[in-house]
Amino acid sequence: MDPNCSCAAGVSCTCAGSCKCKECKCTSCKKSCCSCCPVGCSKCAQGCVCKGASEKCSCCD
């Protein structure tokens, strides 16, 4: 499996527990695209960069 979980937007896919999902655009992905974004953040797949897990992700505003 691609370590970045990359696939077409909206396509069903699964992410491994160790996956960072940096490129994941799948609606079925159970993990956030980055550590400080909530699961389901639609903007997260659009180049979100987090400074830290405890900080709010600006792209999710």
Curated annotation (Swiss-Prot):
The modification Phosphoserine is found at residue 58. A divalent metal cation 1 binds at residues 5, 7, 21, 24. GO terms for cellular component: cytoplasm; nucleus. A divalent metal cation 2 binds at residues 7, 13, 15, 26. Keywords: Acetylation, Cadmium, Copper, Metal-binding, Metal-thiolate cluster, Phosphoprotein, Zinc. The modification N-acetylmethionine is found at residue 1. A divalent metal cation 6 binds at residues 37, 41, 44, 60. A divalent metal cation 3 binds at residues 15, 19, 24, 29. GO terms for biological process: cellular response to cadmium ion; cellular response to copper ion; cellular response to zinc ion; detoxification of copper ion; intracellular zinc ion homeostasis; negative regulation of growth. A divalent metal cation 4 binds at residues 33-34, 44, 48. InterPro entries: Metalthion_dom_sf (IPR017854), Metalthion_dom_sf_vert (IPR023587), Metalthion_vert (IPR000006), Metalthion_vert_metal_BS (IPR018064). Residues 1-29 are annotated as: Beta. A divalent metal cation 5 binds at residues 34, 36-37, 50. It holds the Pfam family Metallothio. Disulfide bonds: none annotated. A divalent metal cation 7 binds at residues 50, 57, 59-60. GO terms for molecular function: metal ion binding; zinc ion binding. Monomer. Belongs to the metallothionein superfamily. Type 1 family. Metallothioneins have a high content of cysteine residues that bind various heavy metals; these proteins are transcriptionally regulated by both heavy metals and glucocorticoids. Class I metallothioneins contain 2 metal-binding domains: four divalent ions are chelated within cluster A of the alpha domain and are coordinated via cysteinyl thiolate bridges to 11 cysteine ligands. Cluster B, the corresponding region within the beta domain, can ligate three divalent ions to 9 cysteines. This is Metallothionein-1F. The lineage of its organism: Eukaryota, Metazoa, Chordata, Craniata, Vertebrata.
